[in-house]
C-alpha cells in the first residue's frame, strides 16, 4: 500500500486524475464510486476531456453499488447520479457504464450476475474508492466479510437519515442496496482510495496502520498488491508513520508508477 499525502483536497483530486489519465488513455475498465470525495477528480477529468481531448470512448465502467427498488432513471439512483456528475459530460458510451440491477426479481442472482459481468469484461483495471468515518467502502459496513461478493446489504439507520435530504422524506429512502463486496473490490488490479478532511483521519489510520479486520472494512486494502491511498493533510493527522510516507514518496524512483 502506498500512502500519498497532499496539502489540500484540490491537490488530492489532481493527483488522482494524474493517476487515472493513463488508464483512460489505454482504454482501461474503470471502477467508479459515487459520493462527495471523488467529485473533484471527476471534475478534473471532465476538464481534461473538454480542454485536452482526453477520450473515454474506449473505456468501460462499473459502479460500486445501487439502491434496491429504484429504477436506473430515478434521479437518486446511483446510475443516474454518476451520469449527472460524470459520465454524461464525457464521451464514454452509455452502454459501457454498468451498475448492479436493483430492480431484479432475484437480488442474489443479480449480485452473482454482476460479478460475472465484471469478470467477462476482463476485470476492473482501477477502482476508485472513498471511505466512511467508520471505515466502510462501498456499502460494506463494519462486520462485512473480507471476501464477500456483490450482494444485498441493509443500510445503516444513520445512512438512511443522512440520505433523506436527497428524497422527499426519510420514508422514501430505500433500505437496501446491492453493493460490490470486499472480495469483488479486491479483484480490481489497482485500488485508488481518496479521503479528505479531519473527520476521516481516524478511519484512514485504521485502514493503513491498524489490523486487517472486519471492524474496518477498508483495512482489506493492506492485502492488495497495488493499493494507492491519497489523502489531504487533515485526513493524515492520526497517522503514526506520516513522516515516513512523505519521505518514501519523495524518494520514489522515477520509473515507478503510482
From Swiss-Prot:
This protein's UniProt keywords: Carbohydrate metabolism, Hydrolase
The encoding gene: nagB
Pathway: Amino-sugar metabolism; N-acetylneuraminate degradation; D-fructose 6-phosphate from N-acetylneuraminate: step 5/5
Enzyme Commission designation: 3.5.99.6
Function statement: Catalyzes the reversible isomerization-deamination of glucosamine 6-phosphate (GlcN6P) to form fructose 6-phosphate (Fru6P) and ammonium ion.
Native species: Corynebacterium kroppenstedtii (strain DSM 44385 / JCM 11950 / CIP 105744 / CCUG 35717)
CC per GO annotation: cytoplasm
GO terms under biological process: carbohydrate metabolic process; glucosamine catabolic process; N-acetylglucosamine catabolic process; N-acetylneuraminate catabolic process
Catalytically driven reaction(s): alpha-D-glucosamine 6-phosphate + H2O = beta-D-fructose 6-phosphate + NH4(+)
GO MF annotations in UniProt: glucosamine-6-phosphate deaminase activity; identical protein binding
Entry protein name: Glucosamine-6-phosphate deaminase
SUPFAM superfamilies: NagB/RpiA/CoA transferase-like
Annotated family: Belongs to the glucosamine/galactosamine-6-phosphate isomerase family. NagB subfamily.
Catalytic machinery residues: 65, 134, 136, 141
Pfam name, any one: Glucosamine_iso
UniProt keyword Repressor present: no
Amino acid at each position: 500500500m502506498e500512502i500519498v499525502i497532499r496539502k489540500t483536497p484540490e491537490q488530492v483530486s489532481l493527483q488522482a486524475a494524474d493517476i487515472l489519465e493513463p488508464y483512460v488513455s489505454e482504454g482501461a475498465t474503470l471502477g467508479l464510486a459515487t459520493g462527495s470525495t471523488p467529485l473533484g477528480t471527476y471534475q478534473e477529468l471532465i476538464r481534461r476531456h473538454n480542454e485536452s481531448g482526453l477520450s473515454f470512448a474506449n473505456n468501460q465502467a462499473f459502479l460500486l453499488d445501487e439502491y434496491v427498488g429504484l429504477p436506473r432513471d430515478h434521479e437518486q439512483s446511483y446510475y443516474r447520479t454518476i451520469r449527472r456528475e460524470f459520465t454524461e459530460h464525457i464521451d464514454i458510451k452509455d452502454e459501457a457504464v454498468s451498475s448492479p440491477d436493483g430492480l431484479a426479481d432475484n437480488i442474489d442472482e443479480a449480485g452473482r450476475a454482476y460479478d460475472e459481468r465484471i469478470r467477462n469484461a476482463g476485470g476492473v483495471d482501477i477502482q476508485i474508492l472513498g471511505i466512511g468515518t467508520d471505515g466502510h467502502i462501498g456499502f460494506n459496513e463494519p462486520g462485512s466479510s473480507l471476501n464477500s461478493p456483490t450482494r444485498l446489504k441493509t443500510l445503516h439507520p444513520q445512512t438512511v437519515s443522512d440520505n433523506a435530504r436527497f428524497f422527499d422524506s426519510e420514508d422514501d429512502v430505500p433500505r437496501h442496496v446491492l453493493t460490490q463486496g470486499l472480495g469483488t473490490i479486491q479483484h480490481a488490479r489497482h485500488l485508488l482510495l481518496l479521503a479528505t478532511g479531519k473527520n476521516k483521519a481516524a478511519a484512514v489510520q485504521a485502514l493503513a496502520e491498524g489490523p486487517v479486520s472486519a471492524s474496518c472494512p477498508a483495512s482489506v486494502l493492506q492485502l492488495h498488491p497495488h493499493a494507492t491511498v491519497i489523502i489531504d493533510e487533515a485526513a493524515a493527522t492520526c497517522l503514526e508513520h506520516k513522516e515516513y510516507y512523505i519521505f518514501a514518496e519523495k524518494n520514489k524512483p522515477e520509473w515507478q508508477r503510482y
